[in-house]
Structure formats: structure tokens, C-alpha cells
């Protein structure tokens, strides 16, 4: 008995120190972070989102869910250098080659994070994504992201699209609170097999409650409005077809054209902010250098103007609260410099954009958005254009297939401008196509690509003799002659005294819905459901023997 007892005591003495010295991750629970306000940008022109601090930066909820034209790609000025992310407010650094988990409790959305956010041009980060992928993700967060060597990395989690969609639907003035868990360890665990940082023998685990309030929602509206502008060699603009809100205007000693280029709504909870700046920027560096600051100006009301000069002039968030539009003025010298630089046949969406800078968040406070309206700028000497007669960039139709169903009709306006009428004008339709029985058909497909349905298509216009000419178009990428269309001529005189003319006509692209061939697929199978297609209509004009 005594021997057995002694043995038991010895065993107990040997086991006890092992239990007492077992290591674990160090867990720190921080005091709740102060509530922070954010501004949410809903960009319907470019189909993306942006979130930015309305006041203090930390804890962070900042950045866009998509790259813009300001993305840094390794050269030039550094603007947008990561996508949107969150942190707990301490901006804690990470150790190279350690592993990192971040997960949320009381998350406002399922699957809120995609991985470890990093600055895209730092060594060890992905220039394309600004993301270090974890071993796995779940409905709460991500796990097993290896901290790469090179530039600094912090406890930042990249936001998922689901998180942005939640922020979008939040009413202005509402708040959410979540618990951010951030854990790093030197232990090389396998998160894909279920292991987690918090369960390892060493490391640091931080826990903090953060609260964010939606202080404002800026909705950028895509009006799809379209207008043509023809410019002569001296830069004098002439408005063509379109419904964009444009007018000729003189500001000081400069004459030119002003247009309402951005439409927006801004709802706030009374937030006051002057760190958010909005201003336009010319995309073409040569043109930006050639024009003066006052050759391009912008305004919130169309009457008081600011020059465009990089970041020097801007409107603040507070100033934008009293308006719902941004106007842009282009002087004749602006257009003249376009001619001198060889810039023609250009869309304003490719010519300039608006920039959004929040000086509070230098790494993720840059954003860019397109205009709500579009101007098609063309030279008045020897040019051709085609626009929808609805004055929209992307006209669309929908219908049903079957006997007696109406065709999908699209109307267009074709304009030529030159010293004389064009000697030849051609038109063609491009899109998904297939030849069946010697005839080309436009092909519409289901979302999964399994159903491909043929549709005939035609181009038609009124000739100068009053007859309707119809071509079988079939999306076949073949030119058809429309020189003999009925053109409406308007003469013009250049500032130099040279004369010319602008000629306009209309053309209709039609897709019948009642042709029997469209009841079956290209593989001769029956089908049901929805199919769709997109394509383009191109025009070209030729002038001969012009001195």
C-alpha cells in the first residue's frame, strides 16, 4: 500500500510541472474603439464602391472595391495603392514569415474578408491585387495568411464585395458594431485543415470592438446621356446631336462650351468634412501640359468656376452638400490644343475623369470616377459619327420570340462633316454570328452558354428617292453602302472663311422576333428561358479629291 502510494505521488510530481509550463497564444482585449463615421460612394457610372473616413482614420474602414485609373502600376505618381480594408485602430505590424488570421464576431455580413491587405508596390505584395491570399476563408474571416518578406505589412483585412453591399444598403445615420480578432504566430499551422492561430502554442491575439456610423451616401448617377461636339481647326465647338446639358459660354475672356458632366445625390447625417476633395483631371499628359489652368474649369452651379490644376483647386465635401451636379467648361483653346496634339474622335470618358482625394487617408483615400454624361468630340473637317437616336451610349431592347411578336428595333443618327459631302459612306454590324444555310445570323446565348439561338437582322434607311433600302445584316462584320441615303445638309463656315457642310441621316437596325429559325438553337434543339447578345454598329466615310 505504501509503495503504491509513493509511486502515485512520484507520478503526480512528474506530471504537474509539464501541465504548469504549457505555453499558449497571448490574448489582449483592448478597450472599445471610439465610434467612427464614414462616407460611402455608390458609383453607378463605373459600377463600383468606395468607402472613406468622415473624420478620424482609425479604426480603419477605407478604400474602393475595384481598381480605378489611378491604380499604381510601378511608375509615375502613386495614388491608389490598395483596395479597401479594415483594422482595429492600432495598425499593428506583422512579422515576416509568421502566419496571420483575422475574423469578425458579430459581423454585419457573411464572408466579410478575403485576405491580408498590403500596399501593392511593396516587396512581397501582389501588384495586381494588393492581397496576400490566406490558406482558407469562412463566414467570419480568413486564416493562415503567410506574411511575406519585404515591405511592411499590418493587421489589415481586405473587404469582400459582400461587405460593400452591406454598407450600400445601410441607411444614413445607422451604425454597426463588430468585434475584430487579429492573431499572428510563428507556428507553421495548416489552416486549410482547421488549425487556427488562436490555438497555437505561441503568438499574439488581439480583440477589439469597433463601431462605424454611415454619415453620408454619395450616389454618382449614370444618366447615359450623350452629345456630339464638332470642333474646327481653331477649336471653336459646334454642338451636334445629343441631349447632354451643354451650352456655349464665355467665362472672363475665354469662350467655349460648358456641360453638366456629373449628376449626384448626397445624403448626410449633418457630417461636416473638409478633408474630402473632388476635382477633374485630364487623362492625356501632353494635353494637360499644353492647356492653361483656365482653359478647363469646373463648377457646382454653372456660374462660379474654379480652374483645373492638379490638386490645387477642388470642391470639398461640405461644398458638395449644397449641390447635385458638377459642370465643366472647355475653352476654345482647350479644343484647339486637342487638334494640335492630334487628339480627335475621342470620348470624354477617355479624355478626363474626376478624382476623389481624402487627405485623412493617404494610402487608400484616392479614387476616380467617370462622368455621368458623355461627349463625343470630333473634328468638323472630315469626320463621321453614329449615335443612338435615344442619345444613350448603350441602347438595349428585350422581347419575346414567337409568331406575331414585335421586332427589336434600334434607331441611329449618322452624321458626316467635311468641306463637301462624303463620296462614300459605309455601315456594318458586328457581334456573335453564325452562318446557317448560307445566311449569317446574329447569335444570342444563355448565361451558361448552353443555348445559342440564331436571329436574322437587317439594316434599313430611306434613300434620296424616298424608297426604303434594306440590307440583310446578320452581325456578319461586312460593310454595306449607304451613300445614297436621304441626307439633311447644314452648311457651315469656318472662322478662316472656309466653307463646308454637315450631313445627317437615320438608319434602323432591326432584329425580328417572329422568324421560325429562332424557335430552335443553332444545334437544332428546342429551347426556353432567356438569351442575350451585344454588338456594335460601325460607320466609315471617304472623301476623294479634296484639296
Swiss-Prot record:
Q: Quote a single Gene Ontology cellular component term.
A: pilus
Which key words are in the record? Fimbrium, Receptor, Signal
Q: Which family does it belong to?
A: Belongs to the EcpD/MatE family.
Q: Which residues form a coiled coil?
A: none
- Identification of the protein by name: Fimbria adhesin EcpD
Q: Where is the signal peptide?
A: 1-23
Query: Oligomeric state and partners?
Result: Forms polymers. Interacts with EcpA.
According to the record, what induces this protein's expression? Answer: Negatively regulated by H-NS. Positively regulated by IHF and EcpR.
As recorded in Swiss-Prot or TrEMBL, the protein's gene is named ecpD
Q: Which domain of life is it from?
A: Bacteria
Where does it localize? Fimbrium
What function is annotated for this protein?
Part of the ecpRABCDE operon, which encodes the E.coli common pilus (ECP). ECP is found in both commensal and pathogenic strains and plays a dual role in early-stage biofilm development and host cell recognition. Tip pilus adhesin, which is required for assembly of EcpA into fibers.
Amino acid at each position: 500500500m505504501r509503495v503504491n502510494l509513493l509511486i502515485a505521488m512520484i507520478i503526480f510530481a512528474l506530471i504537474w510541472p509539464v501541465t504548469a509550463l504549457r505555453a499558449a497564444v497571448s490574448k489582449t482585449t483592448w478597450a472599445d474603439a471610439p465610434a467612427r463615421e464614414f462616407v460611402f460612394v455608390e458609383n453607378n457610372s463605373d459600377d463600383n464602391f468606395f468607402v472613406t473616413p468622415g473624420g478620424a482614420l482609425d479604426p480603419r474602414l477605407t478604400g474602393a472595391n475595384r481598381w480605378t485609373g489611378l491604380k499604381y502600376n510601378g511608375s509615375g505618381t502613386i495614388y491608389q495603392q490598395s483596395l479597401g480594408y479594415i483594422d482595429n485602430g492600432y495598425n499593428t505590424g506583422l512579422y515576416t514569415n509568421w502566419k496571420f488570421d483575422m475574423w469578425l464576431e458579430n459581423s454585419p455580413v457573411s464572408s466579410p474578408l478575403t485576405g491580408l491587405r498590403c500596399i501593392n508596390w511593396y516587396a512581397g505584395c501582389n501588384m495586381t491585387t494588393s492581397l496576400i491570399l490566406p490558406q482558407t476563408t469562412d463566414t467570419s474571416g480568413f486564416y493562415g495568411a503567410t506574411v511575406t518578406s519585404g515591405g511592411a505589412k499590418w493587421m489589415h483585412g481586405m473587404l469582400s464585395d459582400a461587405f460593400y453591399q452591406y454598407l450600400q444598403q445601410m441607411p444614413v445615420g445607422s451604425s454597426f458594431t463588430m468585434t475584430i480578432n487579429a492573431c499572428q504566430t510563428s507556428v507553421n499551422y495548416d489552416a486549410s485543415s482547421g488549425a487556427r492561430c488562436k490555438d497555437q502554442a505561441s503568438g499574439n491575439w488581439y480583440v477589439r470592438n469597433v463601431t462605424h456610423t454611415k454619415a453620408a451616401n454619395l450616389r454618382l448617377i449614370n444618366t447615359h446621356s450623350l452629345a456630339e461636339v464638332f470642333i474646327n481647326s481653331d477649336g471653336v465647338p459646334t454642338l451636334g446631336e445629343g441631349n447632354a446639358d451643354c451650352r456655349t459660354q464665355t467665362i472672363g475672356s475665354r469662350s467655349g462650351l460648358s456641360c453638366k458632366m456629373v449628376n449626384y445625390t448626397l445624403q448626410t447625417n449633418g457630417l461636416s468634412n473638409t478633408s474630402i476633395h473632388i476635382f477633374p483631371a485630364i487623362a492625356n499628359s501632353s494635353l494637360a501640359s499644353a492647356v492653361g489652368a483656365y482653359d478647363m474649369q469646373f463648377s457646382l452651379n454653372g456660374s462660379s468656376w474654379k480652374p483645373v490644376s492638379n490638386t490645387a483647386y477642388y470642391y470639398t465635401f461640405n461644398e458638395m452638400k449644397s449641390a447635385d451636379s458638377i459642370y465643366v467648361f472647355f475653352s476654345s483653346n482647350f479644343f484647339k490644343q486637342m487638334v494640335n496634339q492630334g487628339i480627335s474622335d475621342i470620348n470624354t470618358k477617355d479624355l478626363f475623369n474626376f478624382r476623389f482625394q481624402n487627405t485623412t487617408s493617404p494610402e487608400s483615400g484616392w479614387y476616380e470616377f467617370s462622368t455621368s454624361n458623355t461627349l463625343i468630340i470630333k473634328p468638323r473637317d472630315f469626320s463621321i459619327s453614329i449615335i443612338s437616336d435615344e442619345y444613350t451610349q448603350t441602347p438595349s431592347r428585350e422581347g419575346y420570340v414567337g409568331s406575331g411578336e414585335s421586332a427589336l428595333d434600334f434607331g441611329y443618327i449618322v452624321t458626316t462633316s467635311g468641306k463637301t459631302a462624303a463620296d462614300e459612306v459605309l455601315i456594318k454590324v458586328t457581334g456573335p454570328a453564325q452562318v446557317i444555310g448560307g445566311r449569317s445570323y446574329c447569335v444570342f446565348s444563355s448565361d451558361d452558354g448552353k443555348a445559342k439561338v440564331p436571329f436574322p437582322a437587317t439594316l434599313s434607311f430611306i434613300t434620296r428617292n424616298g424608297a426604303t433600302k434594306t440590307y440583310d445584316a446578320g452581325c456578319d462584320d461586312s460593310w454595306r453602302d449607304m451613300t445614297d441615303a436621304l441626307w439633311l445638309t447644314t452648311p457651315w463656315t469656318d472662322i478662316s472663311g472656309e466653307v463646308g457642310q454637315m450631313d445627317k441621316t437615320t438608319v434602323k437596325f432591326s432584329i425580328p422576333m417572329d422568324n421560325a429559325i429562332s424557335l430552335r438553337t443553332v444545334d437544332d434543339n428546342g429551347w426556353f428561358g432567356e438569351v442575350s447578345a451585344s454588338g456594335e454598329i460601325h460607320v466609315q466615310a471617304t472623301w476623294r479629291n479634296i484639296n
